[in-house]
Amino acid sequence: VIGLGSSFLTDAIGATLNWRISPYVTLGTWGGYTKSNAVIGASGTVETTNWMVYLNFPDLFKQGNLGGIYIGQPPKITSSNLSIGNVPSFLNSAGFASEVAGAQPASTTHVELFYVHRLTDRISITPGLIFLFNPLQTSTSDTVTIGTIRTTFSF
């Protein structure tokens, strides 16, 4: 059984592109791939992919502020031959295991909107919204909506 004490040897590759279309718009993307081989506590391999596309709007409404729209896929198991399926035992025991052997049956889509509002040169507040469609990589899961607010102090 794969648990929190299991060890994996992982090879990972990723790429990022960022294009400043104008002083007020940047377009970017990133993607990644991992292949993990179980070495202690289990046997088998797991492959995952992830990606994101985004638009940033520097100086939106005021110099120093930033708006952002991000759309992507969190890490998704695309292939697995682990003996217990495609998720660790702590997720299996919680009832989140995939019913499809070898890969997760659907893709989670992450949509994020945020706005960095600079209050002073050293303090900013960032409200945001995150939507997770098909969470846990299953099409039967309800959409999750998360509201966020972050305060940043710069020294």
Locate each region found by the language model.
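Outer membrane beta-barrel transmembrane domains
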Residues: 1-7, 14-18, 28-132, 136
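Extracellular beta-solenoid/beta-roll
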Residues: 8-11, 23
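Short acidic-hydrophobic sequence patches enriched in Asp/Glu that either
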Residues: 9, 47, 143, 147
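Extracellular/periplasmic helix-loop-helix junctions in multi-pass membrane proteins
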Residues: 136, 140-142
